[in-house]
Amino acid sequence: MQFTTFALLAVAAATASAQAPQAYYGQGAKSAQVHTFETRKAVPTRVAEVYGEHEQERVTKTKVYHALVTEEAQHHGEEHKAAPYKAYKVYSVASSYSAQPRATHAAEHYGEGKKADHYAEPAKAVHADPHHVDPVKARPTMAATEMKQPEKEAPSTVCAKGSEISCCTTDSSNSGALGNVLGGSCLLQNLSLLSLNSNCAAANTFCCPTTQEGTLNINLSCIPISL
């Protein structure tokens, strides 16, 4: 009888010890499942709350902005009422000219006047002075101002004294005054330095200006001074 009772107690204890871990882990797994479900349900809720807060902030800022714009518009409206500007009506150029020609418009403003092609004759000429010379008519023509061509051979010319004038001659192909006009150059003649700036020796020479002295006058451009 005692053995049987002991055996039953042992079996009951073994069964209880075997079921205890299973019950513990079963409750833990269930708790974890509940926690995970609650977390998944809470995350979208929090996102929605944050979005709602941002949206509310945006709406508030928008209302403040619109209030400022409205206040500014009212302020400018009050300024315009205090100092109104004059509005001008815009007319089309084409329509205004077609509806009201220029001559009619001028007649309304200035009254009927004389015709445009009729003017009173002057009592006397504007320039009654007989010594008055019309500058247009007195302008010289090309025929009057035509340059005279120099003679082929110019007479000997007396050059001015000083270092700014010397004698020059032409090249061999163009002799005389014509050669100088066509581009002869100042050449050193067979003259002493003292004879420079004096009478030109030959008939085919000119006086040529220069800023140099003596032999430095060679190959300067020849410019006729006087004949």
Swiss-Prot record:
Where in the cell is the protein located?
Answer: Secreted; Secreted, Cell wall
Primary site of residence: secreted
Tissue localization of expression is: Expressed in conidia and aerial hyphae.
> According to the UniProt entry, where is the signal peptide?
1-18
The intrachain disulfides are 159-207, 167-200, 168-186, 208-222
> In a knockout, what does one observe?
When the four class I hydrophobins (hcf-1 to -4) are partially silenced, approximately 10 times fewer conidia are produced an the germination efficiency of conidia is reduced by about 50%.
The answer, when asked if Repressor is one of the entry's keywords, is no
Which residues span the membrane? Answer: none
| Keyword annotations from UniProtKB, A to Z | Cell wall, Conidiation, Disulfide bond, Glycoprotein, Secreted, Signal, Sporulation
Reported induction: Expression is increased during sporulation. Expression up-regulated by carbon or nitrogen starvation.
Q: Which residues are glycosylated?
A: 190, 219
Q: Which family does it belong to?
A: Belongs to the fungal hydrophobin family.
Q: How does it assemble?
A: Self-assembles to form functional amyloid fibrils called rodlets. Self-assembly into fibrillar rodlets occurs spontaneously at hydrophobic:hydrophilic interfaces and the rodlets further associate laterally to form amphipathic monolayers.
- Role played: Aerial growth, conidiation, and dispersal of filamentous fungi in the environment rely upon a capability of their secreting small amphipathic proteins called hydrophobins (HPBs) with low sequence identity. Class I can self-assemble into an outermost layer of rodlet bundles on aerial cell surfaces, conferring cellular hydrophobicity that supports fungal growth, development and dispersal; whereas Class II form highly ordered films at water-air interfaces through intermolecular interactions but contribute nothing to the rodlet structure.
**Protein name per UniProt:** Class I hydrophobin 4
Native species of this protein?
Passalora fulva
What would be the name of the gene that encodes this protein? hcf-4
